[in-house]
Every structure is written in structure tokens, then in C-alpha cells.
């Protein structure tokens, strides 16, 4: 998602850094089609790529040589990062790239300076991690984003203090903790979240290797995202290529895809969400422990509550549920279909049925397993009555976790009210509304 232009670090700001960036692209070997233009006008947000002429499917928009990519393998301190790779290992695998960015972004002679000029001040990134905590909770309670941000901030603090800071102190000729601060590091984490690319592994490597490290791809990261995108990035041995996937008329914006992302993921990682009904990949979550809570509330006596506890423990052993897990609901089906199907079935068993099920170690005959594994909307409406009731109660409990109901959200979407909302309020509204629509759709299916 392209961000607004920002303040330059050194000399006065360039009112239009685009020309300098395009010149840099040409010098770096980036091939930009004459049928496209980089612009801040006519885009959904910040910089974007516009069609300067009609485009057909399969047309090359640009190609970026691998030598122009900014990564731990191409930066000025690549040898240093290679030698220290064991000490730079982290859960996120982002640390080497972040160190490369810390160095290149604050070095006036960096070969990527014209690239950074498009993002002159990362403080204008508007991910929820930069919102005041009170605002984050008020606008996003129930969406899953506040919890994800809390984890991010804790990991950023830990990574900076335990890996980044010791590395910088051991290389004082390159890094300065007073310049390369935690705040800058946090901004660069958001920059990598929003703009980096990870090359997919070859199929034969998927089981043996971890994910490829992220990298920055000039020009490719300018494209904005929509679920119904019209361009796609291709990875070739010597370059990365952006190619059209459908006809695009002159003047239209060209969109890439960041993958099948729900609105809460888009806002969390990229700082924006798609208005309803644009995001066909949107989802809503029911926390697994919420289903347990609903089952316990339905228990009529202590013996039934004990049975629910035993059933839950068995589901944990089967790795169908976990204390921090969630069942994921899409517009047309349950994405965690096996987990939800088995959980509903087990929690609705009588004591005798559960005893027999345990003796079979959770196995069932193929026909029964196949019948219960696919939870499309049609299949949800055909669930047995006890499973429907348990799922219905679980949805009601989930809806209670938000601060407002669906009707209140619909009132906010009226044009006169919506236009008066702040950008953050609008983006949060898109997330909440999509989730609640999916949950209410499920209520109707199992009512």
C-alpha cells in the first residue's frame, strides 16, 4: 500500500521526488513500460501505478533486475550481515533486512536514496501499532488487532534490545544507537510489513527450507492492493516482473495483490482495509475458547460441565483446539473446517458417545469423516440441532466482544456520517463491519 510522501532527512524536501526516482530506476536497469506512470493523483492512497494507455492481459508493466533489490544480500553491509548471521537469527527472520534498512536509510550516499525519497518520513505510516492504545482498543476491540499489535510491540522491543542493540554496539563505526533508535526500528518494521516481498519457495524446497527472507522491490511496492487485482508479480532468475492479469483501461489504477488477506490483516500489516463488499477474502474469527465457554454455559449440571472439560482436553490432545486458537469463517465457508467440525461434534456428544469416540482415538469411518469435513454455508445449515445451537451461542458470545452492534455500524456507514469520521475511524469501521456481517450471516444459517 503506497504511503503519503514524507519529510526528507537531510536537505529540504523534494516537492516531487518521482522524477528522481524514475531516473534512478533507469540507471539501475529497471524497465518501465511507456504505458504506465507512477503518480500520487488518481490513486486510492498515496503513490500508485496508473495505466497511461489501454492494457491487455499478459502485458509487461515493468521488470526489476535482482541487482536493484534492497536486501541483506545487496546492501552495503552485506558481508558484515553474512558473517554475523548466526547471532542475528530471530523468530521473524527480518533482523538482517532491518539492519540493512537502518544503515541504508540513514546513509546519505546510499545507492537507494532516490528510492527512500518516496518515503521521506516513516512516521506517516498509520498502522495500528502507531495509534494510542486507548484509540486502538476503542476502535478495534473484538477484531483481534489489539492483541496482534501487543505481540508485535513486545517482539519489537525484545528483538531491538537483545539482538539489534548488541550488534550495533559491536560495530560503532557503522551504527549509532542515538541515530538508529527503537522508534526508527519500529517504523522500519512497519515499512517491511507493508512494502516488502517474500519470494515463494520452489515446491521441492517447501518441506526442507524455511521461508525466504523478505526484500524490498522498488516500483513493485508502489502498487496498491485490492482483492480483485489486475496485475501480478512474477519471479524470474534474473529479475522480478509485474504483468497484467486482466484488461486495464487508460487512466485506471493498476493493483497488485498481497495475497488472500482479511481486512483485519490488511489494517494490522498495511494500515488500510477494503470497504464492504470489496474484500471477498474477508474473514471473522470465533475464538476456540469461546466455543468452550458456550458449551459450559449450556451444561445443565456439574457432571455435564465435567464432561465438557474432558471433551476439551481430548480435543487439545487431537490438536484440534488450543487456548489461543480461532475458528476462521469466510463469506462462503469455514476455513478451519476440520477443526470446527470435530469440535462441535465432540462437544455435543453424550457421555457414552464420547467414551466410544475416545476408545477409537478420535477416528471415524471415511464416509462420516467426509460428511463432517466440509463446512460450506450449505453444510452449516444442515448441521445437527445440538451443533447448530452450540455454534449459535458461540457467535452471540463473539458479537458481545465488540463495543457496538451491527446496526450501529450501518448507521456510521451512511454517507453524511462516514465523511465526518477520521481516517482511522473509517478503516476500523471497515474491519468491524465485515466481520459482523460474516458473523450475522452465520447466525442466520444456524438459527
From Swiss-Prot:
<dbReference type="InterPro" id="IPR046341">
    <property type="entry name" value="SET_dom_sf"/>
</dbReference>
<dbReference type="Pfam" id="PF09273">
    <property type="entry name" value="Rubis-subs-bind"/>
</dbReference>
<dbReference type="InterPro" id="IPR001214">
    <property type="entry name" value="SET_dom"/>
</dbReference>
<dbReference type="InterPro" id="IPR044430">
    <property type="entry name" value="SETD6_SET"/>
</dbReference>
<dbReference type="GO" id="GO:0005634">
    <property type="term" value="C:nucleus"/>
</dbReference>
<comment type="similarity">
    <text>Belongs to the class V-like SAM-binding methyltransferase superfamily. Histone-lysine methyltransferase family. SETD6 subfamily.</text>
</comment>
<dbReference type="GO" id="GO:0050727">
    <property type="term" value="P:regulation of inflammatory response"/>
</dbReference>
<dbReference type="InterPro" id="IPR011383">
    <property type="entry name" value="N-lys_methylase_SETD6"/>
</dbReference>
<protein>
    <recommendedName>
        <fullName>N-lysine methyltransferase SETD6</fullName>
        <ecNumber>2.1.1.-</ecNumber>
    </recommendedName>
</protein>
<keyword id="KW-0489">Methyltransferase</keyword>
<keyword id="KW-0808">Transferase</keyword>
<keyword id="KW-0539">Nucleus</keyword>
<dbReference type="Pfam" id="PF00856">
    <property type="entry name" value="SET"/>
</dbReference>
<dbReference type="GO" id="GO:0018026">
    <property type="term" value="P:peptidyl-lysine monomethylation"/>
</dbReference>
<dbReference type="GO" id="GO:0032088">
    <property type="term" value="P:negative regulation of NF-kappaB transcription factor activity"/>
</dbReference>
<dbReference type="InterPro" id="IPR050600">
    <property type="entry name" value="SETD3_SETD6_MTase"/>
</dbReference>
<keyword id="KW-0949">S-adenosyl-L-methionine</keyword>
<feature type="domain" description="SET">
    <location>
        <begin position="34"/>
        <end position="259"/>
    </location>
</feature>
<comment type="function">
    <text>Protein-lysine N-methyltransferase.</text>
</comment>
<dbReference type="InterPro" id="IPR015353">
    <property type="entry name" value="Rubisco_LSMT_subst-bd"/>
</dbReference>
<dbReference type="InterPro" id="IPR036464">
    <property type="entry name" value="Rubisco_LSMT_subst-bd_sf"/>
</dbReference>
<dbReference type="GO" id="GO:0016279">
    <property type="term" value="F:protein-lysine N-methyltransferase activity"/>
</dbReference>
Amino acid at each position: 500500500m503506497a504511503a503519503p510522501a514524507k519529510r526528507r532527512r537531510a536537505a529540504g524536501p523534494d516537492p516531487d521526488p518521482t522524477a528522481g526516482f524514475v531516473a534512478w530506476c533507469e540507471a539501475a536497469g529497471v524497465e518501465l513500460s511507456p504505458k504506465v506512470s507512477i503518480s500520487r493523483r488518481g490513486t486510492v492512497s498515496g503513490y500508485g501505478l496508473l495505466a497511461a494507455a489501454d492494457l491487455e492481459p499478459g502485458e509487461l508493466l515493468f521488470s526489476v533486475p535482482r541487482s536493484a533489490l534492497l536486501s541483506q544480500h545487496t546492501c552495503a553491509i552485506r558481508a558484515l550481515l553474512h558473517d554475523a548471521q548466526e547471532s542475528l537469527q530471530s523468530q521473524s527472520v527480518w533482523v538482517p533486512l532491518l539492519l540493512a534498512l537502518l544503515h541504508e536509510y540513514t546513509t546519505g550516499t546510499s545507492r537507494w536514496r532516490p528510492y527512500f525519497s518516496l518515503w521521506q518520513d516513516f512516521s506517516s505510516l498509520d498502522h495500528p501499532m502507531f495509534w494510542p492504545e486507548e484509540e486502538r482498543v476503542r476502535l478495534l476491540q473484538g477484531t483481534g488487532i489489539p492483541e496482534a499489535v501487543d505481540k508485535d510491540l513486545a517482539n519489537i522491543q525484545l528483538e531491538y534490545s537483545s539482538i539489534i542493540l548488541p550488534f550495533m554496539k559491536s560495530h560503532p563505526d557503522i551504527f549509532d544507537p542515538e541515530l538508529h533508535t527503537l522508534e526508527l526500528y519500529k517504523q522500519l518494521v512497519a515499512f517491511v510489513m507493508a512494502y516488502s516481498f517474500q519470494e515463494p519457495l520452489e515446491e521441492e524446497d517447501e518441506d526442507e527450507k524455511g521461508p525466504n527472507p523478505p526484500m524490498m522491490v522498488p516500483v513493485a511496492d508502489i502498487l496498491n492492493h485490492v482483492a480483485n487485482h489486475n496485475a501480478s508479480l512474477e519471479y524470474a532468475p534474473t529479475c522480478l516482473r509485474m504483468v497484467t492479469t486482466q484488461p486495464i483501461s487508460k487512466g485506471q489504477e493498476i493493483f497488485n495483490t498481497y495475497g488472500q488477506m482479511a481486512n483485519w490483516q490488511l489494517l494490522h500489516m498495511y494500515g488500510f482495509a477494503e470497504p464492504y463488499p470489496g474484500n471477498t477474502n474477508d474473514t471473522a474469527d470465533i475464538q476456540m475458547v469461546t466455543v468452550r465457554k458456550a458449551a459450559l454455559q449450556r451444561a445443565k449440571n456439574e457432571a455435564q460441565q465435567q464432561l465438557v472439560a474432558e471433551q476439551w482436553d481430548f480435543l487439545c490432545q487431537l490438536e484440534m483446539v488450543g487456548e489461543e486458537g480461532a475458528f476462521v469463517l469466510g463469506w462462503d465457508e469455514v476455513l478451519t473446517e476440520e477443526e470446527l467440525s470435530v469440535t462441535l461434534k465432540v462437544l455435543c456428544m453424550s457421555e457414552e458417545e464420547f467414551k466410544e469416540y475416545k476408545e477409537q482415538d478420535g477416528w471415524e469411518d471415511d464416509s462420516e469423516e467426509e460428511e463432517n469435513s466440509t463446512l460450506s454455508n450449505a453444510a452449516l445449515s444442515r448441521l445437527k440441532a445440538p451443533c447448530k445451537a452450540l455454534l449459535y451461542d458461540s457467535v452471540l458470545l463473539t458479537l458481545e466482544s465488540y463495543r457496538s452492534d451491527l446496526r450501529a455500524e450501518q448507521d456510521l456507514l451512511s454517507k453524511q456520517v462516514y465523511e465526518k469520521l477520521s481516517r482511522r475511524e473509517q478503516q476500523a469501521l471497515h474491519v468491524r463491519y465485515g466481520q459482523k456481517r460474516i458473523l450475522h450471516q452465520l447466525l442466520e444459517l444456524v438459527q
